[in-house]
Amino acid sequence: MLDNKDIATPSRMRALLDKYGFNFKKSLGQNFLIDVNIINNIIDASDIDAQTGVIEIGPGMGSLTEQLARHAKRVLAFEIDQRLIPVLNDTLSPYDNVTVINEDILKANIKEAVENHLQDCEKIMVVANLPYYITTPILLNLMQQDIPIDGYVVMMQKEVGERLNAEVGSKAYGSLSIVVQYYTETSKVLTVPKSVFMPPPNVDSIVVKLMQRTEPLVTVDNEEAFFKLAKAAFAQRRKTINNNYQNYFKDGKQHKEVILQWLEQAGIDPRRRGETLSIQDFAKLYEEKKKFPQLEN
């Protein structure tokens, strides 16, 4: 085992790379944190205590994991790269509250793993430097499963983070904003420079905090259908919702008048663009659509 100096330093990271002859895989989005201050900011934002269970995705060499282990009751980490398992066994050997599962997070039975490893934790947080190429699928997969997650403090590509946290009417606001804000209250923690990673990524990064709502922001009877309807309004951002929905519905061009009636009954001006509609507006559209069986997709 190497000395137990913090992993998140350039010298310790290079020593680990040399010891294990490790080469970064670009296809896995491997950019490891080498700045303890950034990690401390993430830990602080996570409100982790001795009763918290943490899910981490992509622990890498354990930079963030070791700090999580020092603060949380238990850490459950999913690492897809088999080559990193012996490294993590080494770097995390001082901690008996960490479980590393060598699986793809998108294929793993997360609910079962949580029940097996975090069952005695009072709170569960997802805290991770997410692989940038699959950030959105990971978050949606976690949010849409029946897993008792209280919140997320996650690093991601700045552009994606801004979309999650976007306000109605902004350029970043879109269907992803709606899905994430339906489930969670979102806020920005900090912007992160490229220099705190090894190797530096090609994009800027951001840490966002997403706290699970006790109830979704609006009430709908079919979340999947609701999200599809909202997404259709952004199909071509420069077009009006009237145009986008004409293209979205089966025989929409033949039902122009019906679409206008539907929008009018929902109190939505057909000349508006999708980015100007709030989640509550989309919920009205979704409910009113039930009165118009001609509008199929």
Swiss-Prot record:
| NCBIfam families reported for this sequence | ksgA
| UniProt function note | Specifically dimethylates two adjacent adenosines (A1518 and A1519) in the loop of a conserved hairpin near the 3'-end of 16S rRNA in the 30S particle. May play a critical role in biogenesis of 30S subunits.
Name the GO cellular-component terms. cytosol
> What are its E.C. numbers?
2.1.1.182
Gene Ontology molecular function: any one: RNA binding
Query: Could you tell me what this protein is called?
Result: Ribosomal RNA small subunit methyltransferase A
Q: Where does this protein come from, organism-wise?
A: Staphylococcus aureus (strain bovine RF122 / ET3-1)
Main location (coarse class): cytoplasm
Record keyword rRNA processing present = yes
Residues bound to S-adenosyl-L-methionine: 31, 33, 58, 79, 104, 129
> By its UniProt entry, which PROSITE patterns does this protein fall under?
RRNA_A_DIMETH, SAM_RNA_A_N6_MT
Q: Where is this protein localized, as stated in its record? A: Cytoplasm
Q: Which PANTHER family match?
A: DIMETHYLADENOSINE TRANSFERASE, DIMETHYLADENOSINE TRANSFERASE-RELATED
